[in-house]
Regions:
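A short alpha/beta connector and helix-capping loop motif
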Residues: 217-231
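One face of beta-strands
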Residues: 55, 131-135, 205, 225-229, ...
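C-terminal outer-membrane beta-barrel translocator/porin domains of Gram-negative envelope proteins
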Residues: 1-45, 72-217, 261
């Protein structure tokens, strides 16, 4: 396929979908950051109940794209403007990208685990590679109580452009922080959730822990931490959270999030 599009630097979720647009319109924040990309790609996807994989070859150019509006309900009510878009490096590259996801268990009343590995390599104006792994476990406990644990980690190699760093903030990573507040050449992430109720309606409490930066300094860096609670409807199909950053560099704030297809 050929394309000329706004592209998200985020590895998690889909920042260009409906839920991101709703949060931007109501609350003035997004799940980006974004850059402009134009090029061609060809790929292959396969999905079964237990295995999902995709691989693609691409050739594309990247450049920065300015934010065009600050309009939101929160902005009209006096909230400050959202941060500017990222300053992406202007490059032309060709490369390969792929993702493999394995799942064990499908019964929501039993242990369900997943494992994912994803990576990318590019050559051209810059030469770089990215590699990350992650896993999740969701388990029912007792008295309609359930829990989930998610972890992931990744690193990069070579001359990584700004738009291919890791951005570890948002509803799928560390909630309540700005999209460009936790970024670096390597990262780690741990998320825990506890929920009580029935699939149609659950109350949820959560904690997010993560950090990003240079690999050599990642182990000694203070993590970013957020905690909060929320409501899950229809087994996570619709989710509303109130999150609070409690530790990390930069401003700590409350954030209300609406999103779809949550883990619990």
């Amino acid at each position: 396929s050929a394309y000329y599009r706004l592209q998200a630097a985020n590895d998690w979720g889909n920042p260009l979908n409906l839920e991101s647009s709703i949060n931007a319109l109501l609350f003035g924040y997004d799940f980006g950051p974004y850059y402009r990309a134009g090029g061609v790609s060809i790929g292959l996807k396969m999905e079964t109940r237990k295995v999902r994989h995709e691989v693609k070859a691409f050739a594309e150019s990247h450049w920065a794209d300015e934010k065009n509006t600050n309009v939101s309900l929160a902005n009209l009510l006096g909230r400050s403007d959202p941060p500017p878009n990222m300053q992406a490096d202007e490059i032309t590259i060709a490369g390969l990208a792929g993702r493999l996801r394995l799942q064990a268990g499908v019964d929501p009343d039993a242990l369900v685990t997943t494992g994912t590995i994803w990576g990318e390599a590019g050559v051209g104006d810059v030469q770089y590679a990215r590699l990350a792994i992650g896993a999740t476990a969701t388990v029912p406990l007792f008295w309609r109580l359930g829990g989930s644990l998610e972890w992931s980690a990744g690193t990069t190699f070579g001359d990584v452009p700004t738009q291919r760093l890791y951005y570890v903030a948002g509803p799928q990573t560390v909630r309540s922080f700005e999209a460009n507040q936790i970024t670096g050449e390597a990262f780690w992430l741990v998320r825990t959730e506890m929920a009580v109720g029935y699939p149609i309606f659950r109350l949820v409490a959560f904690g997010d822990f993560g950090s990003a930066g240079e690999l050599s300094e990642l182990g000694s860096a203070d993590p970013f931490v957020a905690v909060g609670g929320g409501v899950s409807l229809l087994d996570g199909l619709l989710r509303a959270d109130l999150a609070r950053g409690v530790h990390g560099a930069g401003p700590l704030r409350w954030q209300f999030l609406l999103y779809l297809d949550a883990l619990m």
